[in-house]
């Protein structure tokens, strides 16, 4: 099995986007559909999707948009500074705002208490807070959010990597989402591979990164 660290994966992504001119929004869409492909939509009909404001969050919003288009019940929780949102995040957020008003930005412990009650009503949580680029201890609202996700003990799917896990070493950056399923995009991430607790829960899905990009970097 091919395994890469976070820096190598970033170089592959950048080569595909900058050199081969694969639109990043296309990769986001393929990532979203890869996650949905692995959900039993007859059993799982209501979702809380928790997103950061970067590209992992963009994947989460694209998942939300597709599920909303299918008529599923979706709540979206945004964790992070929206002034730092990626362009792909913004595009998907603008679309989601036209499909639902259940978009929340928890800012306080009181907001989290409301969120905790809301999470009890959904069948599935999708974790798209942090991707492989996390290199700092998780604190503040993000730490509370991850702790809350774990405390609900709801079936949880992580996009690419469990939020809070180091993409290279598998170490914990404080709180880590205890995922039931991980959909890893294109290539297994070393941090997941090194953590046996997560490795066996991981499915690798092709999201359309050309093999030429992979060969150019590896």
From Swiss-Prot:
It comes from Anaerococcus prevotii (strain ATCC 9321 / DSM 20548 / JCM 6508 / NCTC 11806 / PC1). K(+) binds at residues 56, 127, 163. Its cofactor is K(+). It catalyses: (6R)-NADHX = (6S)-NADHX; (6R)-NADPHX = (6S)-NADPHX. Its EC number is 5.1.99.6. It comes from the Bacteria. PROSITE patterns: YJEF_N (PS51385). One of its GO terms (molecular function) is metal ion binding. Belongs to the NnrE/AIBP family. Keywords: Isomerase, Metal-binding, NAD, NADP, Nucleotide-binding, Potassium. Binds 1 potassium ion per subunit. Residues 9-215 form the YjeF N-terminal domain. NCBIfam families: yjeF_nterm (TIGR00197). The lineage of its organism: Bacteria, Bacillati, Bacillota, Tissierellia, Tissierellales. PANTHER family: NAD(P)H-HYDRATE EPIMERASE (PTHR13232:SF10). Disulfide bonds: none annotated. (6S)-NADPHX binds at residues 55-59, 131-137, 160. Catalyzes the epimerization of the S- and R-forms of NAD(P)HX, a damaged form of NAD(P)H that is a result of enzymatic or heat-dependent hydration. This is a prerequisite for the S-specific NAD(P)H-hydrate dehydratase to allow the repair of both epimers of NAD(P)HX. InterPro entries: YjeF_N_dom, YjeF_N_dom_sf, YJEFN_prot_NAXE-like. This is NAD(P)H-hydrate epimerase.
């Amino acid at each position: 099995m091919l395994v890469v660290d976070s820096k190598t994966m970033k170089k592959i992504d950048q080569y595909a986007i900058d050199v081969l001119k694969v639109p990043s929004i296309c990769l986001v869409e393929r990532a979203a559909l890869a996650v949905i492909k692995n959900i039993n939509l007859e059993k799982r009909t209501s979702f809380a999707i928790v997103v950061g404001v970067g590209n992992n969050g963009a994947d989460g919003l694209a998942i939300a948009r597709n599920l909303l288009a299918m008529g599923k019940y979706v709540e979206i929780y945004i964790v992070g500074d929206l002034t730092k949102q990626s362009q792909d995040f913004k595009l998907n957020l603008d679309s989601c705002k036209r499909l639902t008003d259940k978009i929340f930005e928890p800012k306080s412990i009181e907001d989290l208490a409301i969120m905790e009650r809301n999470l009890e009503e959904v069948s599935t949580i999708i974790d798209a807070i942090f991707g492989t680029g996390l290199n700092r201890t998780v604190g503040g609202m993000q730490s509370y959010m991850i702790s809350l996700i774990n405390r609900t003990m709801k079936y949880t799917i992580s996009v690419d990597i469990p939020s809070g896990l180091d993409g290279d070493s598998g170490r914990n950056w404080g709180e880590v989402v205890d995922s039931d399923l991980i959909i890893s995009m294109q290539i297994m991430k070393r941090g997941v591979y090194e953590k046996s607790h997560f490795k066996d829960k991981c499915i690798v899905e092709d999201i359309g990164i050309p093999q030429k990009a992979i060969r150019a970097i590896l």
